[in-house]
Swiss-Prot record:
The keyword Repeat applies. InterPro entries: Pentatricopeptide_rpt, TPR-like_helical_dom_sf. PPR repeats lie at residues 179-209, 210-244, 245-279, 280-314, 315-349, 350-384, 385-419, 420-454. It comes from the Eukaryota. Pfam families: PPR, PPR_2. It comes from Arabidopsis thaliana (Mouse-ear cress). Belongs to the PPR family. P subfamily. This is Putative pentatricopeptide repeat-containing protein At1g02420. Keywords: Repeat. PANTHER family: OS03G0856100 PROTEIN, OS12G0638900 PROTEIN.
C-alpha cells in the first residue's frame, strides 16, 4: 500500500491510500499502452491519410503501397481515424478510393463510422452525397442505425427543426424501410442531443404517423428529471397494452433516483419482482447513485452486497457509482477500499475510476500526485479519456508546467486518446502566455496534421507570437497546411 494524498485540511480531504494492485509504481517511459503495431497495415494507411494534403497524393500512396484493402482493414482504419480525430476530408477520399475498386463493397460499420467522422466535422453536404452514392451501389448498408448516426451529428450542431427535417430527408432517400424503428431513432437522438421536452413534443406531433412500441416508450422514459413526466409516459404505455420490461423499469427507477425519491425506486423494484422481472446490474447501479445523491454512501455500499444475494454481481460501473459517493463525501479511504475490492474480484478500474480521484486531486490542486496518478494510469494500460486530459491540462496550466503539458500532448498524439480540440485550447494558451513559440508551433502543426482545426483565438495568438519571433516562413508554411480546412483562415 502507499499514501498518495497528504492530509489537506483546507479542503477537508482525509488521508487515503491507493492499492498497489490498482496503481503499481511504474516509470512513464516503461508504460505499456496498447497501440497499433508499427508494421500494421491499418496504422500505415492511417498515416497515409493524415500525411497527405492532396487527393492525388493519397491515391498515389495507396496505389504504390501494395496493401490489400479488405473490409476488415477499412473498418480498422476508420475506427482509428474516429478515435484519433484524423483528417475527415482525406478520410472520405480514402473511403471513396476503396469504393471504386471493382467488386468491393463497404461494411455497414464503415459507412456509419465514415458518416460519424463527417458529421463531427460539420461536413453535412458530404454526408448526403455519400448516402446518395451508397444508395446507388449498396442500399442494404443504410439502416436505422445509419440514420441515428447522421441525426445525432445534426442534432449535436443544429436545431430541433433541422434535425426533424433531416429525418424526413432520410424518408425521401430510403422510403422502403421507414418505420417505427426510424421514429425511435429520431426520439433517441433528441433525448441524447437535445432535451426530453423536445423529444416529448416531437413524439406527440408525429406519433399518429407511426405505431409506437415498447422501445418507443423505453426511450421516452429515460432521462427525465421530473417523475411526473415519466409516469405519464408509463401510463400511456400501459394504456396501449404494452408490458414493461427490465429496461422500462430501470428507466423509471433512474428518474426516481435522480429526483431523490428513493422510496419510490425501492417500491418499483418490489413491483418488478412481483411481475417476475429480475432487477439487473443497471437497476442496482442506479440505486447506488441515488443513495449517493441523498448522502447515504454507506447504504449504497451495502447494495453491492445485497445484489450478490440475488445472484447479480457488480461490474465496474456499479463500483464506480459507489466510489463516486465516497469521493463526494470526502471519505477517500473508503473509496480506495472499494477500488481494492473490485481489483481483487478481477475487475479493472477504467478511466472513469481514475477520474473520480483526478477530480479530488484537482480540487486539492495537488500537482505532484496528479502526475503520479497519470503515470500509473498509463502503466496499468488504461488510456485516459477527454475528462482525464482536461483535469490534467488545466492543472498544468495553473502551475505553468510546460514540460508536463507537453508530455501529455505527446502521449495523446502517439497513443491516440483525448480531444485535441479541447486540450489544445488550454495547452496553446499556456504556451503563448509563457512565450514558448517553438513548442506552440510544434503542437499546432501536429494538430493540423491530425486533421483538426485550431480555434481562431489560438491560431491568432500563435501566429502573432511567431511573427514577433521573425518566423515568417514558418507562418506561411502553417497557413499552407491549414488550407485543408474549408473555412477561412483568420488573419
Amino acid at each position: 500500500m502507499m499514501m498518495i494524498l497528504k492530509p489537506l485540511s483546507s479542503h477537508h480531504v482525509s488521508n487515503f491510500r491507493l492499492s498497489v494492485s490498482f496503481l503499481h509504481s511504474v516509470a512513464l517511459s516503461d508504460a505499456k499502452v496498447p497501440v497499433e503495431e508499427e508494421g500494421d497495415d491499418a496504422e500505415t494507411v492511417f498515416r497515409m491519410i493524415n500525411g497527405s494534403n492532396l487527393q492525388v497524393e493519397l491515391k498515389e500512396s495507396l496505389s504504390s503501397s501494395g496493401i490489400h484493402l479488405s473490409k476488415d482493414l477499412i473498418d480498422r482504419v476508420l475506427k482509428r481515424v474516429r478515435f484519433s480525430h484524423g483528417n475527415p476530408i482525406q478520410t472520405l477520399e480514402f473511403y471513396r478510393y476503396a469504393s471504386a475498386i471493382r467488386g468491393f463493397y463497404h461494411s455497414s460499420f464503415s459507412l456509419d463510422t465514415m458518416l460519424y467522422i463527417l458529421g463531427r466535422n460539420r461536413k453535412f453536404d458530404q454526408i448526403w452525397e455519400l448516402l446518395i452514392e451508397t444508395k446507388r451501389k449498396d442500399r442494404s448498408l443504410i439502416s436505422p442505425r445509419t440514420m441515428q448516426v447522421v441525426l445525432g451529428r445534426v442534432a449535436k450542431l443544429c436545431s430541433v427543426r433541422q434535425t426533424v427535417e433531416s429525418f424526413w430527408k432520410f424518408k425521401r432517400l430510403v422510403p422502403d424501410f421507414f418505420d417505427t424503428a426510424c421514429f425511435n431513432a429520431l426520439l433517441r437522438t433528441l433525448c441524447q442531443e437535445k432535451s426530453m421536452t423536445d423529444a416529448r413534443n416531437v413524439y406527440h406531433s408525429l406519433k399518429h404517423q407511426f405505431q409506437p412500441d415498447l422501445q418507443t416508450f423505453n426511450i421516452l422514459l429515460s432521462g427525465w428529471k421530473s417523475s411526473e413526466e415519466a409516469e405519464a409516459f408509463f401510463e400511456e404505455m400501459k394504456g396501449k397494452g404494452l408490458k414493461p420490461d427490465v429496461v422500462t423499469y430501470n428507466s423509471l427507477i433512474d428518474v426516481y433516483c435522480k429526483d431523490r425519491e428513493i422510496e419510490k425506486a425501492y417500491k418499483l423494484i418490489d413491483k418488478m419482482r412481483e411481475e417476475e422481472e429480475t432487477p439487473d446490474v443497471i437497476t442496482y447501479t442506479t440505486v447506488i447513485g441515488g443513495l449517493g445523491l441523498i448522502g447515504q454512501p454507506d447504504k449504497a455500499r451495502e447494495v453491492l452486497k445485497e445484489m450478490k444475494e440475488y445472484g447479480c454481481y457488480p461490474d465496474v460501473a456499479a463500483y464506480n457509482a459507489a466510489i463516486r459517493n465516497f469521493c463526494i463525501a470526502r471519505r477517500l479511504g473508503d473509496a480506495d477500499k472499494l477500488v481494492d475490492e473490485m481489483v481483487k474480484k478481477g475487475l479493472s478500474p477504467n478511466a472513469t475510476t481514475y477520474n473520480l480521484f483526478f477530480r479530488v486531486l484537482s480540487l486539492a490542486n495537488d500537482l505532484g500526485r496528479s502526475w503520479e496518478l497519470y503515470v500509473r494510469m498509463l502503466g496499468n494500460e488504461c488510456l485516459p479519456n477527454t475528462q482525464s486530459c482536461m483535469f490534467l491540462i488545466k492543472m498544468f496550466k495553473r502551475h505553468e508546467k510546460v514540460d508536463m503539458a507537453m508530455r501529455l500532448w505527446e502521449d495523446m498524439v502517439v497513443k491516440g486518446f483525448g480531444s485535441y480540440s479541447l486540450v489544445s485550447d488550454v495547452l496553446l494558451d499556456l504556451l503563448c502566455d509563457l512565450a514558448k513559440v517553438e513548442e506552440a508551433e510544434k503542437c499546432l502543426l501536429e494538430m493540423v496534421e491530425k486533421g483538426h482545426r485550431p480555434s481562431n483565438v489560438s491560431f491568432k495568438r500563435i501566429k502573432l507570437l511567431m511573427e514577433l519571433a521573425n518566423k515568417h516562413d514558418e507562418v506561411n508554411n502553417l497557413i499552407q497546411k491549414m488550407a485543408i480546412f474549408s473555412t477561412e483562415i483568420p488573419r
